[in-house]
Design a protein with these regions (language model features):
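Short loop/turn motifs that connect adjacent beta-strands in outer-membrane beta-barrel proteins
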Residues: 23-29, 89, 160-168, 196-209
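Detector for outer-membrane/organellar transmembrane beta-barrel domains
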Residues: 110-178, 186
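Hydrophobic/aromatic-rich structural module bridging two neighboring secondary-structure elements via a short loop
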Residues: 75-116
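Residues that define the transmembrane beta-barrel architecture of outer-membrane proteins
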Residues: 28, 48-52, 59, 75-79, ...
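Cleavable N-terminal export/targeting peptides
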Residues: 1-29
């Protein structure tokens, strides 16, 4: 939910091909990659079918800037820009979600659009990670009375290894009534289980393959998606 993408990708590419060091001596790290998924699943909803989801990012000394996109078979596509800072297990960040569809304008943050800015706070304890997200600008959602809801979502996730496969289990909920997540009050809207395994393609090359089973207890929906990462 892209204008700055060309400039951003150029910066990332330049960083990959020429060693850059920040003034404090810490190298700037860059990464670029993509996922290909059978369904685009997000927070208890299926947003799209098969999709190509590229990402590019820079990180220096805990400060990161990244762009992520999703483009499927429909006319709509999504671009998310994230600025975040992490230290220890603590992370704070802001994400701009931009849904590009017919008639949409990037600088339009009115409540009637799908354009939205979200702030997040999180802490990774190792065995368990906690994250809180709140819509703060644009499509913030409405309460049943018509007031701004500042729709929020919090999630508890836990990684583990079983049978030689990396797993992650997560449960997410929205804490109060809002039409953004379609909740009339506190509601658990996402319960997911994701498995990831490296598949060897030769002696020195492998790709991660992952599968996600996601349920939405509130809407009584169940989704399944598989994907590969490059």
């Amino acid at each position: 939910m892209k204008k700055r993408m060309v400039i951003f990708a150029a910066i990332a590419a330049a960083t990959v091909f020429s060693p850059i060091s920040a003034h404090a001596g810490e190298p700037i790290k860059a990464e670029i990659g993509t996922d290909i998924v059978s369904s685009y699943l997000w927070r208890g909803s299926r947003l799209d079918g098969p999709a190509f989801q590229p990402t590019v990012g820079l990180e220096w000394n805990g400060l990161s800037l990244s762009a992520w996109g999703s483009s499927g078979l429909s006319d709509a596509c999504e671009v998310d820009l994230t600025l975040a800072y992490s230290i220890g297990g603590f992370t704070v960040g802001v994400t701009d979600y931009w849904a590009a569809y017919t008639g949409a304008k990037f600088f339009d943050f009115s409540a009637e659009t799908l354009h939205m800015a979200e702030v997040n706070l999180g802490y990774d304890f190792g065995p368990v990670a906690l994250n809180w997200y709140t819509n703060c600008l644009g499509a913030v959602g409405c309460t049943p009375e018509g007031a701004k809801a500042y729709a929020s979502y919090f999630e508890v996730s836990a990684p583990f290894c079983l049978g030689g496969i990396d797993w992650s289990a997560a449960v997410g909920a929205t804490p109060w009534a809002n039409d953004y997540y379609g909740a009339e009050g506190f509601a658990v809207i996402c319960a997911s289980l994701t498995a990831t395994k490296e598949i060897a393609l030769g002696s020195d090359f492998s790709i991660p393959v992952f599968a996600s089973l996601m349920a939405n207890p509130r809407s009584e929906q169940l989704f399944f998606s598989v994907g590969v990462s490059f």
